[in-house]
């Protein structure tokens, strides 16, 4: 189901199914002077966060800076981007056990899990156990919104800033 990002919902997203990438691939390759995935996609999604293998200090630090500011520095270059980063994964315990614990981010690799500043920069946590599983009764035989139309709408709306739109509600 997590391949929805790339194959079914949005051609503007990429799914890193292996969980492995490098700083050069993700952000900026200093040898070729080319911006990485965050400069070329609306959303870079990591499938199975527990499988993320690059937990180097550089990767975590650059990712934290990017998540906080929408920019990162590589060498003497400072690059801005507005790509979202999504982390997907399964829990290793039952829902009841997860609800009793205070660390819902346990599936992340140790390099991330020991960095509270990384988790401070996460904007949303969607507990998958609260999302209904897809089944025939959820589909309609009436008119509906085709996913590529919705995807294009979301892609076009990225140029608008709604950051302050929610202030009156919080």
Segments from the language model and where they lie:
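Conserved AAA+ ATPase small/helical "lid" subdomain
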Residues: 123-170
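Conserved AAA+/SF3 P-loop NTPase catalytic/coupling segment centered on the Walker-B
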Residues: 40-66, 92-101, 117-118
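Conserved nucleotide-binding/hydrolysis micro-motifs of P-loop NTPases
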Residues: 50-52, 85-95, 105, 129-134
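Loop/turn-to-beta-strand initiation segments
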Residues: 40-43, 80-86
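Short, small-residue-biased leader/transition segments that mark boundaries at the very start
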Residues: 1-5
């Amino acid at each position: 189901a997590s391949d929805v990002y790339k194959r079914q919902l949005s051609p503007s997203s990429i799914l890193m199914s292996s969980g492995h990438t490098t700083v050069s691939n993700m952000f900026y390759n200093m040898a070729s002077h080319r911006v990485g995935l965050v400069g070329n996609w609306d959303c870079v999604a990591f499938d199975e966060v527990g499988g993320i293998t690059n937990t180097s200090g550089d990767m975590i630090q650059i990712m934290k800076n990017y998540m906080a500011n929408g920019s990162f520095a590589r060498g003497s270059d400072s690059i801005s981007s507005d790509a979202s980063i999504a982390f997907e994964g399964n829990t290793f315990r039952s829902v009841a056990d997860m609800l009793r614990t205070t660390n819902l981010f346990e599936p992340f690799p140790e390099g991330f899990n020991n960095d509270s500043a990384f988790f401070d920069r996460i904007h949303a946590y969607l507990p998958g156990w609260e999302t209904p599983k897809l089944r025939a009764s959820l589909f309609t035989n009436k008119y509906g919104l085709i996913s590529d139309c919705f995807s294009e709408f979301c892609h076009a709306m990225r140029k608008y800033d709604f950051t302050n739109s929610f202030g009156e509600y919080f």
